[in-house]
């Protein structure tokens, strides 16, 4: 008899109660509670994934399901710990929730993780102590698995270098598995996050195709304090309607606009995926900007964070390994505008713009030529001009 599909939603635990609302307008104060709630929700989903019976995965899961669930879990937990949630009680609560998620799957985890932990033993980080305590606090005895691993107090760079071959092997293994092995892979990788964060960081990045997702608040912090470059790939129409991110004066030069190409109707009918093609063309233009290099930290922002992922993946594939995506984009439910971080009017703002190329005809009302322009209060007339400029020209 064919295996009966198991509904993921049927295995979900009741969602935790929402954290109490705060009247503070400071995103730094709200972030830990919001992130912890997101982490708890993600953990519930991961628990559902891990508690599927071995007979079910062939019908219930795909490679995309596994990669998506794992990266979502790690991203939300990382937010809880990194965005203002460094207090000991915050970390302990998140790790205990993770322990509860792993608990039902331990029989599956052990057989899948023994060899992985032997390879990862030299790179077990100090975080394993917190993970161990959290598992024990949740009533899980991790001793049989942890006995394989040995603590290593090494510098972070050495840990990451040592983790690379393990992560590479893990990615190859996960992508080559058959459907019947997906749950085992999911469980092993999830436990690897608890015990060996450097390995999981590299694995999740490879599965995702780009560095990771940042909340709007995280993106603002990275741009203003660490020099990250924020690249807005929205169309001029979308920017005029929704506005631009409001940045401090010392960070305004970190915002660059590279609108997606608007392929002509005839050309759209000739390509397999016009939306993807437009995003990949924008990524190639970004890769040639003088402002950024392959070692630069870049955050891609679109309207709802869907197209931005394609842009980030394309940049990663050509050597830009530090590409992030702003979760929710500018206009999404958890995007910049909804995060109340400040919005500037497009007509009154100053942002460096790379306009569409001459190879692809511009739509009506848009300039031709690949140019860098300064958009300001006096720029509306210049945007309406029909002058053709050579590539790289500046007006």
Swiss-Prot record:
Protein name: Calcium sensing receptor, chloroplastic
Gene Ontology CC terms, in alphabetical order: chloroplast thylakoid membrane
Keyword 4Fe-4S: no
PROSITE patterns, A to Z: RHODANESE_3
Lumenal, thylakoid face of the membrane: 40-182
Ranges where the Rhodanese domain occurs: 224-345
GO biological process: cellular response to calcium ion; de-etiolation; regulation of stomatal closure
Transit peptide: 1-39
Compartmental location: Plastid, Chloroplast thylakoid membrane
Stored InterPro entries: CAS_plant, Rhodanese-like_dom, Rhodanese-like_dom_sf
Topology in membrane: Single-pass membrane protein
Residues recorded with modification Phosphothreonine: 377
Superkingdom in the source lineage: Eukaryota
Function: Modulates cytoplasmic Ca(2+) concentration and is crucial for proper stomatal regulation in response to elevated levels of external Ca(2+). May function by regulating concentrations of inositol 1,4,5-trisphosphate (IP3), which in turn triggers release of Ca(2+) from internal stores. May play a role in de-etiolation.
Post-translational modification: Phosphorylated in both bundle sheath and mesophyll cells, under both low and high light regimes (70 vs 900 umol photons/m-2/s).
Keywords: Chloroplast, Membrane, Phosphoprotein, Plastid, Receptor, Thylakoid, Transit peptide, Transmembrane, Transmembrane helix
Annotated spans, Disordered: 1-27
Spans within the Stromal topological domain: 204-395
TM segment ranges: 183-203
Biased composition (Low complexity): 1-12
């Amino acid at each position: 008899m064919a295996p009966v599909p198991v509904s993921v939603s049927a295995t979900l635990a009741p969602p935790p109660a929402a954290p109490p609302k705060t009247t503070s307008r400071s995103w730094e104060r709200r972030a830990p509670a919001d992130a912890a709630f997101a982490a708890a929700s993600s953990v519930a989903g991961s628990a559902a994934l891990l508690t599927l019976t071995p007979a079910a995965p062939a019908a219930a899961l795909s490679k995309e399901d596994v990669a998506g669930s794992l990266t979502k879990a790690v991203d939300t937990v990382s937010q809880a710990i990194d965005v203002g949630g460094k207090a000991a009680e915050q970390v302990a609560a998140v790790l205990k929730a993770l322990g509860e998620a792993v608990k039902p799957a331990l029989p599956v985890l052990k057989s899948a993780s023994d060899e992985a932990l032997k390879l990862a033993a030299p790179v077990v980080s100090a975080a394993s102590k917190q993970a161990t305590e959290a598992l024990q606090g949740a009533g899980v005895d991790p001793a049989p698995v942890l006995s394989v691993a040995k603590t290593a107090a090494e510098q972070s760079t050495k840990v990451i270098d040592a983790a690379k071959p393990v992560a590479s092997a893990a990615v190859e293994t996960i992508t080559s598995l058959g459907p019947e092995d997906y749950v085992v892979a999911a469980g092993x990788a999830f436990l690897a996050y608890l015990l060996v964060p450097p390995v999981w960081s590299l694995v999740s990045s490879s599965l995702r195709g780009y560095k990771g997702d940042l909340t709007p608040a995280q993106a603002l912090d990275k741009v203003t304090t660490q020099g990250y470059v924020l690249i807005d790939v929205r169309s001029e129409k979308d920017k005029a309607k929704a506005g631009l991110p409001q940045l401090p004066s010392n960070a305004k030069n970190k915002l660059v606009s590279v609108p997606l190409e608007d392929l002509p109707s005839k050309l759209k009918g000739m390509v397999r995926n016009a939306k993807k093609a437009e995003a990949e063309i924008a990524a190639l233009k970004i890769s040639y900007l003088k402002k950024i290099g392959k070692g630069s930290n870049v955050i891609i922002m679109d309207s709802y964070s869907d197209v931005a992922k394609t842009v980030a993946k394309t940049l990663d594939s050509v050597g830009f390994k530090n590409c992030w995506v702003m979760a929710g984009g500018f206009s999404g439910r958890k995007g910049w505008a909804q995060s109340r971080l400040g919005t500037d009017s497009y007509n009154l703002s100053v942002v460096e713009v790379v306009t569409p190329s001459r190879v692809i005809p511009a739509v009506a009302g848009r300039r031709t030529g690949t140019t860098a322009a300064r958009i300001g209060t006096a720029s509306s007339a210049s945007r309406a001009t029909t002058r053709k400029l050579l590539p790289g020209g500046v007006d």
